[in-house]
Structures are given as structure tokens and as C-alpha cells.
Amino acid sequence: MLRNWMIKRFKQPEINEIKVKHEAIIKHLLNMIPGCKVKHKHNFDTGSVAFYMGISGITKELTISDQYLQDYTAIEIFDFIKQKEVIKIISTHGKVRISMREGYPAINYR
């Protein structure tokens, strides 16, 4: 029977990989939107990470599902953001969500 400390140790590399992706996404957003401030928060209820971008006193939200973060590399995530013009969508809409639908990434916004 595995003890709690053993389970935590086995899961550690996956957690570190996700944290690295979070930091890479923050740096990417800072490069794409000059002058913005980015904070992130993990929502365990919805299984996603919300990146809050402060742009000229207005807060915009980019939410990315945990499943999408686990299934794709940071470079693939950046390519998807560029290909789907997520930054333009964020500028016109307040909230954008990237999630998995039927095995493929999808964008929802409002």
C-alpha cells in the first residue's frame, strides 16, 4: 500500500510541469500585450487556471482547462493562441476560455 508521502512524490514531476507551463503562459501574455499585468489562479472546482490581465485599469480573463494544459506542450498552446487570435478576442470580450471538446481544443468567449 502506498503511503501519502509516496503518492505526493510520484505526482511531483507532473505538478512541476504544469507550474512551468503557467509561468511560460504568463511570460507569453506579457510579451503579447505590452504594459499589462498578469496574475493567475487555479480553480479546482472547474479544473482550470484563470489568467487575469490588467490592461489600462480593465481586467480581462483567459481561462485554460487543466486537461488542455496537460495534453499540449507550451509551444503548442502558444501556437493555438496565435492561430485563433485569442489576444484580439480578449480585447473585445471580457472572458475567454480554452477547453477540450470532443478531443479537440475549443474557444468560448463572452
Name each region found by the language model.
Residues 2-40, 72-97, 109:
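Negatively charged, low-complexity tracts enriched in Asp/Glu with abundant Ser/Thr
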Residues 53, 66, 75-79, 95, ...:
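Surface-exposed beta-strand edges and their flanking turn/coil or helix-capping segments
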Residues 58, 95-110:
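Polar/charged, Gly/Pro-rich intrinsically disordered segments
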